[in-house]
Amino acid sequence: MRSGCVVVHVWILAGLWLAVAGRPLAFSDAGPHVHYGWGDPIRLRHLYTSGPHGLSSCFLRIRADGVVDCARGQSAHSLLEIKAVALRTVAIKGVHSVRYLCMGADGKMQGLLQYSEEDCAFEEEIRPDGYNVYRSEKHRLPVSLSSAKQRQLYKNRGFLPLSHFLPMLPMVPEEPEDLRGHLESDMFSSPLETDSMDPFGLVTGLEAVRSPSFEK
């Protein structure tokens, strides 16, 4: 009888061990790879950077013409796809411009339609302050929004202004272009009703946007 109880206890312990092994626990201090979404195949982020003492703060933007510059706030062209292409190496692509962030021989950033492993892949390093540095293995320079004059001034110093980036989630979900245009045209084509509870016609304009559940 006693041996039977021992066998039952063994089976129970084995079952508990398998259950725990099959479901890894999530710890609150799991590490930066969890908080920064490094486990995701593609991260949608805005890359925020700022100069000394918080001056010249902006978001990296890849425009449709391939120009890479600063956006004062989050915009459609500052929304980026960050995708791992190798160990600790990523490719960065503009969601709306459909251009890859790439670096020229002089360290100038540009957006290219064709991905190049040499010019458009960057080593991703997370710093203790939470900011990321993206460095080109080929050119041995960090991604930076600094000007040509600044790059020359800081040459061989191991640091460039506007080269530390904070990955940020989009603050406002994007609306479909056709819906946003429709609402804006309706909103600004009608005169304001100053004595109305809805002077801008927001409620009226949104009545056309109905949940699929209402159609049941």
From Swiss-Prot:
Assigned GO CC terms: cytoplasm; extracellular region; extracellular space
SUPFAM superfamilies named among the record's database cross-references: Cytokine
Pfam families membership: FGF
Induction comment: Induced by the bile acids receptor NR1H4 that binds and activates a NR1H4-responsive element within intron 2.
Tissue: Expressed in fetal brain, cartilage, retina, and adult gall bladder.
UniProt GO MF annotations: fibroblast growth factor receptor binding; growth factor activity
Keyword Secreted on entry: yes
Stretch forming the signal peptide: 1-24
Annotated disulfide bonds: C58-C70, C102-C120
Gene3D superfamilies in UniProt: 2.80.10.50
Main localization of the protein described in the UniProt heading: secreted
InterPro entries in UniProt: FGF15/19/21, Fibroblast_GF_fam, IL1/FGF
Localisation: Secreted
One BP term from GO: positive regulation of D-glucose import
Coiled coil: none
The entry's keywords: Disulfide bond, Growth factor, Secreted, Signal
Functional note: Involved in the suppression of bile acid biosynthesis through down-regulation of CYP7A1 expression, following positive regulation of the JNK and ERK1/2 cascades. Stimulates glucose uptake in adipocytes. Activity requires the presence of KLB and FGFR4.
Subunit structure: Interacts with FGFR1, FGFR2, FGFR3 and FGFR4. Affinity between fibroblast growth factors (FGFs) and their receptors is increased by KL, KLB and heparan sulfate glycosaminoglycans that function as coreceptors. Interacts with KL; this interaction is direct. Interacts with KLB; this interaction is direct. Interacts with FGFR4 in the presence of heparin, KL or KLB. Interacts with MALRD1.
Note: Contrarily to other members of the family that can bind several FGF receptors FGF19 is specific for FGFR4.
Family per similarity comment: Belongs to the heparin-binding growth factors family.
Name by which UniProt lists this protein: Fibroblast growth factor 19
Organism from which the protein derives: Homo sapiens (Human)
Lineage, top ranks: Eukaryota, Metazoa, Chordata, Craniata, Vertebrata
Gene from which this protein is expressed: FGF19
